[in-house]
């Protein structure tokens, strides 16, 4: 799972747990999609949020976004990675679509202007997925934006050569859809 959160003066004021689905056929946990809300129980999600707050405290991360990747084993979360930033998978946009909290805007307003954006999460009743448009490296991009999606973006134009980054399956764009 992934936890995307936000801290103000050491307090975790926002936390959302998402299911992080990776390609099973490739090494290294190459991400395929994120799903909100998590399919794990509320108890597991609460443990993830508490562990995120504890990790932030121990690492002295006090203000701004926090991203934590965790593995769940027997209903118990274990940290894989913690970093004081927005995640690298455009989760801020999925979170904005899902519960009307804009972590990107909140980060800029708070960290640059020292102003805290007021927010009140209002999760929609739908499960949403952020799904990456992926292709093999060095192939010619064949994808296109999904007009049925809530949001869709391609990093390449049709026919562009897909750059090799991980050598297995490269991100070429993403869509946000209802499941």
Regions found by a protein language model. Give the residues of each.
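A short beta-strand motif that forms the metal-chelation/ATP-contact edge
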Residues: 5, 76-86
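Active-site "cap" helix and flanking loop/linker of ATP-utilizing ligase/carboxylase catalytic domains
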Residues: 46-68, 83-138
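A broad structural signal for short, well-ordered beta-strand segments within beta-sheet-rich domains
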Residues: 12-14, 30-32, 79, 139-145, ...
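A short, glycine/Asx- and small/polar-enriched loop/turn
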Residues: 72-78, 169-171
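Peripheral (often C-terminal) accessory segments that flank ATP-dependent C-N-forming ligase machineries
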Residues: 106-179
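Internal nucleotide-binding/catalytic subdomain
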Residues: 1-74
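Pocket-edge structural micro-motifs
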Residues: 16-19, 81, 135
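Residue-level signal for secondary-structure boundary sites
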Residues: 11-13, 23-25, 88-90, 138-141
């Amino acid at each position: 799972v992934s936890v995307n959160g936000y801290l103000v003066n050491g307090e975790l004021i926002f936390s959302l747990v998402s299911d992080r689905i990776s390609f099973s056929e490739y090494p290294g946990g190459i991400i395929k999609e994120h799903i909100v809300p998590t399919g794990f129980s509320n108890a597991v999600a609460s443990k993830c949020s508490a562990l995120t707050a504890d990790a932030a405290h121990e690492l002295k991360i006090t203000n701004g976004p926090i991203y934590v990747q965790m593995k769940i084993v027997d209903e118990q979360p274990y940290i894989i990675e913690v970093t004081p930033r927005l995640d690298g998978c455009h989760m801020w946009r999925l979170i904005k679509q899902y519960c009307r909290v804009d972590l990107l805007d909140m980060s800029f307003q708070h960290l640059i202007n020292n102003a805290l954006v007021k927010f009140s999460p209002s999760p929609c009743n739908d499960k949403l997925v952020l799904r990456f448009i992926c292709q093999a490296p060095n192939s010619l991009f064949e994808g296109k934006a999904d007009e049925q999606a809530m949001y869709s973006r391609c990093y390449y134009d049709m026919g562009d050569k897909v750059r090799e980054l991980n050598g297995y399956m490269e991100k070429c764009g993403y869509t946000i859809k209802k499941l």
